Amino acid sequence: MDKKAIKTFAIQARRSLIESIKLKLENLGITKDGVAEKMSQSTNEIEYYGDKGLSITGQDIRRRRELVARLKGMAKQEEWSDALTDLIEEVAYTWFNRIIAIRFMEVNEYLPSGVRVLSSETKLKVPDILREAFEIEDDLGGYSVDEHGIIQKALDTEDPTDMDAAYVILFTKQANALNHYLPELFEKTDDFMQLLFTPSYSSGVIKDLVDDIKEDDFDVDEGGQVEIIGWLYQYYNTEPKDAAFKKKKYLSSDIPAVTQLFTPDWIVKYLVENSLGRYWIRVLHDRGDERTSLQIAQSFNWQYFMPEAKQDEISTRADLSKKRVEEITFVDPAMGSGHILIYAFDVLLQLYQSEGYSRREAAQNIVERNLFGLDIDRRAFQLTYFAMMMKLRRENRRSFELQLHPNVFEVPSTSLELKDFSGAKDGSPIDSGNLSDVLGRFGAGKELGSLITFESSIFDDKLINKIVSEREAGQLTFEMSDQVNHQWELRNLIRVGKALSSQYTISVTNPPYMGSGKMPKTLAKFVGKYYPASKSDLFAVFMERLQHLTKENGIFAMITQHQWMFLSSFKALRERMSSWPIINMAHLGTRAFEEIGGEVVQTTAFVVQKQKLQGFIGTYERLVDFDSQKKKQQAFLTAVQNPNLNYVYRTKQTNFEKIPGSPIAYWASKKKLELLQYSSYRLQNILSAREGMTTGNNALFMRSWHEVQFFKISFLSTAHQIERDKTWFPYNKGGAFRKWYGNIWYVINWKNHGEAIQSNIDKKTGRIRSHNYNGKFGFREAITWSAISSGMFSARYSPTGFLFDSKGVSSFANDHTTLLFCLAFLNSNSSSSFLELLSPTMDFKIGQVLNLPLAKQHSPQVVELTESLISSSREDWNSFENSWSFTTNILLTNIAEHHRNWTVEAAFQQWQKEADDRFNQLKANEEELNRIFIDLYGLQDELSPEEEDKDVSVRRANLPRDIKAFISYFIGCVFGRYSIDTPGLAYAGGDWDASKYKTFIPNKDDLILLTDDDYFGDDRDVMTRFKEFLTTTFGSENLNENLKFIADALGKRGDSSEEQIRAYLRDDFFKKDHLSTYQKRPIYWEFNSGRNGGFKALMYLHRYDRNTVAMIRTKYLHPLQEAYERKLVQLKKFEENEQQTRQKNKYKKQITTITKELDELIKYDEKLQHVANLHIDLDLDDGVLVNHAKAQADTKILTPLK
């Protein structure tokens, strides 16, 4: 199955259908602005609408009125524009579903007429339904005289226009005729829908489907599956889902799109075979079948069945020897497009056949007795219904005549109330209360779906049964005619309610995933009240619901996100789950779904017996380290054949209780369990930890340190003495994986002890928005770590002087030595192995970290090694300019001893050796620490001290990165931020000190041009300055060699080294490197005239003043404009005099380029003049984002910070 082609088709089909429908609506005078009146020239026979004055006649006039009435009715419940959008979506998906269904039926020869509708069996361009229109007239319900004439004319002339007209009639009749056989999918077409869709076999969705999706993907005899319907549906929803995901909170209408995820085929098989299949194996064993469970599974070809672990003595299970296959009920309460139910159908068919049933009889029983499903999404319900009917049709050619209705349901919403039923007044208070309860629970059915619960006895209520049976008995007593509709609606509610109140032998689902923060209000309130243990996410709520839906001694199976296994917010749910034994779990981790990349969705599939079995040993397949869906699948299949592999674990659930928080850490060794359970000495005995501050508005109170003026930052504050004249204070805020030292990016406004932060009031609530100031812990030396990580845990030493954030947890000890010992342990692989059990979700809570067992011996060697590791990590961090302790570029560290007569390549090789030495020494020291702690904890059989290079935090040399850092340092020197003569920052706000610059003098103006050529030959040109800088630092003798080395490292195109470096500075320096180095808070801003690049230049933020833009216009833009004009004149002369065509064309191309640049400069000059006249002042305390926007005054004169 070519899923890429399927996805492309489905997405494009939706777009095409929607655009076509919008256009037809506009032609009918219906737009987002409302409904247009018919034009004055209209008559009773013909009406004109829209800007184009298009006409409609006959039945189309009536259809338009129905359409308008439908829209106005919808608009009573929502805004007009929303009603119009919803109707467009409804019409689009209605026709999409029908087209897909017809395609599946025609390929598999399931259409009652036996004639293809969308294509030709003999590969003709014209569909067979046109060629055989009169042969199948009875199948399509007959033709009117007019229809007969149109079809006959088309067959006679074969004119494309006539053929199209006939095809519209035939296609629509076929869709309506299928209503008799498949009423839930092919509902009787509302007449207005025919106005909004014109089927065509020669272009559009139908043609694309036939041409682009392989026929074999639909053909069940050629390996095709009805599951293709599910894939098409998921991909059809791609764009609505992407749009909904961007919302902070979902609407009820978003729920289907954001929660639909088609389950991979092998996971469906795993879930069904290990629940339904396992249950039947128990039946056979109780009947006396002596084969092993694996042998029985293999006899059915259940490849994904995993036998149970060998058990100690456990509680007796219920006897299933008398269980008949007809009695097994199977439910999917979040069925989507029916993937799980369809495979359950296949398995049940095997079971029936093994019991002696014919396939035909078995299929009818399965549909009528065994399978049940529910969903809130009508489209998904229709597709599941269709898929079930197709499975039935495959086994029984006469199934359409049986008028069977599979037990799959759309959970509806209703606005009905007790007062809508006249018969309700005759009921007792209890009966009336029951009816009111039923109606009330379905009030938000479209949001709550299968989460709605009932006591089954409620449907024995006399009043309810009286109302729903009255029509059948011919005793219609309604006082109002529309109460007939109410009765039918109530009957549907009762059918769905009975399905929701029932319990089932087997319950299996892939539930919707939705965090509580994004739930619509009604849903969030409901789960908070009725599912408090699992309210954090919808998937967890369904875990509880599945337990309730499953009969005692039954089995339920799911695939969910794996957070419930570990997070403290799901501890109550884990306690509830502990009542039932986990028979098997395939812990999938990331990338279990090929449609979802990255580390976001981590999943686990599991099978649970709803029977209390003391001491049950579950089997767990740890597939998290296999990095693709296919590899996980293969690893599981391998484990079935060889269950003794090192990623297959067996353990009792009672073992989880030995671990703090009781996570489902099935891979915990006996030794670690003992340490976690019995250790009396833990980190919490010697460390105090605090979750840090929440400012309430980081955008207002927090900055990257380089954004503000350096002299305003406090570096000397302690817990006992705070620098009162400073505004900004160092602030720990977690960050990426890094051990020992670093991730020092931020400062926070703590002026006057955080006066601004502590007085920031939420206007809505009247409360202070910030909290957790941790006053007595502020500015103390600490261990800090990132609360959330995308990888391993890493802790860092934080010297005195820092405040800390909620995402940068800090912990404190009574003395320096103890702090370093704890830091050493936290960064050891022993600690990591414990944290994998306590916090596998990479969300490192304080309680989990402080619960780590701690060895009592405080080795002096550990402290000595830790001091060395911190020192090495600090040296590495300070080697680059994103550190405020940066002194000089790594390639210039040793130039003095070479008397500035060296090559850049030699300098790089020296740095490379230093970096490698530091890397290797740090790695060796970390491995020595690992060895010490492994010995202290007795984990020699489980861990080895060796460390992978990727887990070493310090950096090795990297030629492209380090050359770019050198160029960045050069830019800093040009602007005076750095000086060759002054270590560290020379200027970052405050008073300019010219004495700091002797060897290389910064530009007088706060600008350096980034042009494609040297137009001035002075310090306005970036390459002129760069060559001067290279000559100053490395000597003139090596200039060309150094330029070539740098150019080669950058890898840009160009005819010379200078051209390559110039191209990098002009095209890549700002957008590709500076923005990322400074985390989208750049200190150098790029002036940019637009797409043609007529004017590009860098400015240093800290040197900006209110006259900078005016200076740029007069001293740089205008002279550059004149230079362009001179060059243009010169090029035109060259072009006129040139005889060779190739060179002449080259000149023409250059003339076109520079002409575009000049035109762009003229427009840009207007923008600059506007901004210059405003004389805008910036306050660096406001931060880069605010100032970057402010400096442009609603124009676009700077490159965006993207």
Swiss-Prot record:
Pfam families: Eco57I (PF07669). This is Adenine-specific methyltransferase PglX. The keyword Transport does not apply. Keywords: Antiviral defense, Methyltransferase, S-adenosyl-L-methionine, Transferase. It comes from the Bacteria. Its EC number is 2.1.1.72. Belongs to the methyltransferase superfamily. PglX adenine methyltransferase family. GO terms for biological process: defense response to virus; DNA modification; methylation. Gene3D superfamilies: Vaccinia Virus protein VP39 (3.40.50.150). NCBIfam families: BREX_1_MTaseX (NF033452). GO terms for molecular function: site-specific DNA-methyltransferase (adenine-specific) activity. It comes from Lacticaseibacillus casei (strain Zhang) (Lactobacillus casei). It catalyses: a 2'-deoxyadenosine in DNA + S-adenosyl-L-methionine = an N(6)-methyl-2'-deoxyadenosine in DNA + S-adenosyl-L-homocysteine + H(+). The keyword S-adenosyl-L-methionine applies. Disruption phenotype: Loss of whole genome N(6)-adenine methylation in the fifth position of the hexamer 5'-ACRCAG-3', no visible growth phenotype. Has a higher plasmid acquisition ability (when plasmids have the methylation hexamer) but a reduced ability to retain plasmids. BREX systems (bacteriophage exclusion) provide immunity against bacteriophage. Part of a type 1 BREX system which protects against dsDNA phage. This system allows phage adsorption but prevents phage DNA replication, without degradation of the phage DNA. Methylation of bacterial DNA by this protein guides self/non-self discrimination. Probably methylates the adenine in the fifth position of the hexamer 5'-ACRCAG-3' in genomic DNA. N(6)-methylated adenine on the fifth position of 5'-ACRCAG-3' is found in the genome; there are 1906 sites in the genomic DNA.
